[in-house]
Design a protein with these regions (language model features):
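Enriched for short, Lys/Arg-rich terminal
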Residues: 1-3, 9-25, 29, 50, ...
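A short, surface-exposed loop/turn module that caps and links secondary-structure elements
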Residues: 33-60
Length: 90
């Protein structure tokens, strides 16, 4: 099981998600899978990122609700970097 670390930017992004009344249960399901080191279903479109987020991964909680994260296996940590819409993040 991975320990979760949230960046300060993720915490700001999260406040926007809550204000938008997004379905938090969908996020909790994805988070649970990641914490327990289980692979995500294809519907989440989990993939590696390049550019500014090189070394990170992105998954789609909903078609326009993304989660950017990375896993540090050596210290068993899941770091949540950003969450929001495509226009919020890119």
């Amino acid at each position: 099981m991975l320990k979760v670390k949230m960046t300060s930017q993720f915490k700001k992004d999260w406040k926007k998600i809550v204000k938008r009344n997004c379905d938090i249960k969908k996020f909790e399901k994805v988070l649970s899978l990641l914490i327990n080191e289980q692979s995500l279903d294809e519907k989440y479109k989990d993939h590696k990122l390049i550019g500014d987020y090189n070394g990170c991964r992105e998954c789609h909680i909903e078609p326009d609700w993304l989660l950017i994260y990375y896993i540090e296996n050596d210290i068993l940590t899941l770091t949540l970097l950003r969450t929001g819409t495509h226009s919020d993040l890119f």
